[in-house]
Amino acid sequence: MMVKFLLLALVFGLAHVHAHDHPELQGQWKTTAIMADNIDKIETSGPLELFVREITCDEGCQKMKVTFYVKQNGQCSLTTVTGYKQEDGKTFKNQYEGENNYKLLKATSENLVFYDENVDRASRKTKLLYILGKGEALTHEQKERLTELATQKGIPAGNLRELAHEDTCPE
């Protein structure tokens, strides 16, 4: 994922969290929703429309591996990217559809919220929020919190893509 994901806002609060402080980070996850200021990046078959499956941390979470599917022409392709923790101790960086700098903003046993800034090969910057869960759709309250966070991050509130029921890639 990441991130593009990724990996991957804050649907549930605004405190920054550290990946190594959250053992619930690792494991099986599914993309619940994505928001982006450049909506074309997350539209159906868009380059940053990621269907996350798993997150693992190595070396004390200095490396975060995100396994996800991308879908092109109806075909799901499995991909794994590795993000490397940066000097600030919060941001991870990886190369996927350009350069990604992302942070875990919120972690619970049910959801993860990531903020990502992607700069593609044409130097176009995209701000994204990735919300991961266990396969459930967002509640009304979660959507409200997410749109508030998106606005704070410069992402239009209407640019929400809910993917919980659109994910047809293998488990």
UniProtKB/Swiss-Prot annotation:
The species this protein belongs to is: Mus musculus (Mouse)
Quote the PTM field: The N-terminus may be blocked.
Keywords, alphabetical: Disulfide bond, Olfaction, Secreted, Sensory transduction, Signal, Transport
Q: In which tissues or organs does this protein occur?
A: Expressed in nasal mucosa (at protein level). Specifically detected in septal and lateral nasal glands.
| Quaternary context | May form a heterodimer with OBP1A.
**Signal peptide interval:** 1-19
Name of the featured protein: Odorant-binding protein 1b
Disulfide-bonded cysteine pairs: these are C57-C61, C76-C169
Would the keyword Ribonucleoprotein be found if you checked this record's keyword annotation? no
| Superkingdom of source | Eukaryota
